[in-house]
Amino acid sequence: MLKHSLIAASVITTLAGCSSLQSSEQQVVNSLADNLDIQYEVLTNHGANEGLACQDMGAEWASCNKVNMTLVNQGEAVDSKDWAIYFHSIRLILDVDNEQFKISRVTGDLHKLEPTDKFDGFAAGEEVVLPLVGEYWQLFETDFMPGAFVSAPNAEPKMIASLNTEDVASFVTGLEGNNLKRTPDDNNVFANAVSRFEKNEDLATQDVSTTLLPTPMHVEAGKGKVDIADGIALPKDAFDATQFAAIQDRAEVVGVDVRGDLPVSITVVPADFTGELAKSGAYEMSIKGDGIVIKAFDQAGAFYAVQSIFGLVDSQNADSLPQLSIKDAPRFDYRGVMVDVARNFHSKDAILATLDQMAAYKMNKLHLHLTDDEGWRLEIPGLPELTEVGANRCFDTQEKSCLLPQLGSGPTTDNFGSGYFSKADYVEILKYAKARNIEVIPEIDMPAHARAAVVSMEARYDRLMEEGKEAEANEYRLMDPQDTSNVTTVQFYNKQSFINPCMESSTRFVDKVISEVAAMHQEAGAPLTTWHFGGDEAKNIKLGAGFQDVNAEDKVSWKGTIDLSKQDKPFAQSPQCQTLITDGTVSDFAHLPSHFAEEVSKIVAEKGIPNFQAWQDGLKYSDGEKAFATENTRVNFWDVLYWGGTSSVYEWSKKGYDVIVSNPDYVYMDMPYEVDPKERGYYWATRATDTRKMFGFAPENMPQNAETSVDRDGNGFTGKGEIEAKPFYGLSAQLWSETVRNDEQYEYMVFPRVLAAAQRAWHRADWENDYKVGVEYSQNSNLVDKASLNQDYNRFANVLGQRELAKLEKSGIDYRLPVPGAKVEDGKLAMNVQFPGVTLQYSLDGENWLTYADNARPNVTGEVFIRSVSATGEKVSRITSVK
């Protein structure tokens, strides 16, 4: 008994000591998290020009920037060295010039800052400056991520309060002057009140009561208006119940009663359509005083005709329609939106709201990017780890319960870094989409961008091995444990980013996932007809053209210097892949991703799925469309035009692929709206894509865009027709989510510019020239009717400003209101806006706002604050100023 008492006393004493230790460590974490004020100041984006050894540090393209990271301790003194700050940096940190601290990269964008032996503590009120050298440049505020946190052994990690905010401007300074330039030769026009005013000067308010978005193929305007104050009598039997409900939902938004008085006749008569009108989605419609008559090629055409009725309605005064007749058909069969819910999750409600708007503007393909390195977002029955582990990001260094934090998500799961669609959620999305004539295309990205899957299946492997179930543990394992390949992916992950394409277990995994997803589609009554393989960026960036070997005899100044002998191609050190190379199944390691795509296409075809889709670089080593087992093989083409895309897109079409134009420099909606550091987004392909630029994109004549736009540095480029090829299959607008951390940010980035993508996908404009081999375009070619382009955009912009933005607001969409242009001349304020019809306001003190009228320009002095305001007055743009 005495022995037991002594043991018990010893245990209690030990536990008390542990509790005391844990408490002191937690106190340090809490103190630093609550009291450290962290600020970033950009010092230069031209490191090499400022004497920094970018090349010797191994910076890609020998390009680096310098930033001061300043830490101010606003709390009590901290003497402990046993702590670390984890912070997110999309740029690799190459050097920290402070002997008291060291920085290491954990994985992806997650970096670790910790004290060295020379650390002498944080005194109360002390300011510590850490000069950081990072790769490339940092030109926009959203290059800097929130979500830094403090950790210590035996303590719960805690978010640093000063970086627990979406107000990035509160901790970033220095983005001005030359620091706005990517290089000293950057010729972009930076957005300010005056430059916006000059850009908008060719726009004018005009009557657009008979103008419809997207523009129909043929419109004949009548005289007068048709009274619909008492609603329209839409025949309910023309649609199934779910589609009629979808139509009713849109009718409520625009303020039209579909069970009213004005007769509407709808018939589906495909035999009556010939030539360019004989295709799915086509319709003819007549709107007259005695009723509306619709004749459709198919059910999709009937649905779109009704959407055209709603499109002509002014939701702020929904009592009339213009008399007119329409003959209409879509330009492309594929009119898509891609939404990345993997990097950061977006809610089911946000997806449903997107489907509503897609239907209203006649878009018909929702491509869901469901998986990536940073997250797996779809429940798969039988593989619970995919969502238990792969759908969550938190601070677990072993990644047994979650993925490590990325992209500003911090140490906890209570944000959009975590989340997934349950099976029921996904089935609901499918049903909702089907009712709106939209096909949902699921993308499970592989073999690259697959870290969430790989880590999840390793967690599954470990669980089952602990249970003694070795065969079951290996059933769906995705990495070769003997693979020692040293690789760095585009977003700075190691070999865990890749599904090993040489293992039978990988093929079983793909088969399992496709089967489960197909079953969900079947349950929803929307059979799976297209499987998106992903396939992009299966490479080691260190073997790219931006690096040279440390021992190279003829080094160039514009490449980073590294030891290339330590770098591998993906899978090069995998014994299982080496076997495939040795036995001649695959010619070399570079061909493995395309080989894997071909193998997956066989699984897809065996399951009766007719269409196989991928990002084009994933298929680059395949021998054309005939190498795939499915009826159709489609590629999202995403080469940048000024890097050769004006020509290479036609190569893919010539190989027999159905090309879906998806160019990042024109239809990526994660790029900033303006060349302004306040705007959100990545900008590797273009410094900005606003609604006007997207509207002016010529998707079938790629060289033409060289005359109407510039490269990412604001310089001209050339494009020449070189290859004869079949017509393209479609157009897709993409929203990648690295910088998009919540639904509000998501809708801001997508709307309203996605309406310009809808316009280009449905309608070919007169100013779009035919593609011709031998014709070259540039800033000086003068082959494009730019007057016609500008007039066309003016109409489009007026429809947005006068009608469509109000509909977005009534739909609850957090769209972006344009920042006004303004100038002061002779003491008078002049203002304009990208979408005529949007209300403008100004203020002399930043608090009291007055409505601007161009016919009564006000006299002003000093700094004048400006903004635009929505139709309800409840939503305002970003506020800027002019002097």
Swiss-Prot record:
Domain of life where this protein originates: Bacteria
Induction: By chitobiose.
Lipidation, S-diacylglycerol cysteine type: C18
Substrates-to-products reaction catalysed: Hydrolysis of terminal non-reducing N-acetyl-D-hexosamine residues in N-acetyl-beta-D-hexosaminides
Intrachain S-S bonds: C54-C64, C394-C402, C502-C577
Cleaved signal peptide residues: 1-17
Post-translational changes noted in the entry: This protein is probably a lipoprotein, its processing is inhibited by globomycin.
Lipid-substituted positions (N-palmitoyl cysteine): C18
One Gene Ontology term of the molecular function aspect: beta-N-acetylhexosaminidase activity
Location(s) in or outside the cell: Cell outer membrane
Any single biological process term in GO: polysaccharide catabolic process
Membrane topology of this protein: Lipid-anchor
Enzyme Commission number, as recorded: 3.2.1.52
Gene3D superfamilies named in the record: 2.60.40.290, Chitobiase/beta-hexosaminidase domain 2-like (3.30.379.10), Glycosidases (3.20.20.80), Immunoglobulins (2.60.40.10)
CDD domains the record matches: E_set_Chitobiase_C, GH20_Sm-chitobiase-like
Transmembrane segments: none
InterPro entries: Beta_hexosaminidase_sua/sub, CBM2/CBM3_carb-bd_dom_sf, CBM2_carb-bd_dom_sf, CHB/HEX_N_dom, CHB_C_dom, Glyco_hydro_20_cat, Glycoside_hydrolase_SF, Hex-like_dom2
Family under the similarity heading: Belongs to the glycosyl hydrolase 20 family.
Biological function: Hydrolysis of terminal, non-reducing N-acetyl-beta-D-glucosamine residues in chitobiose and higher analogs, and in glycoproteins.
Protein name from the UniProt record: N,N'-diacetylchitobiase
Gene name as annotated: chb
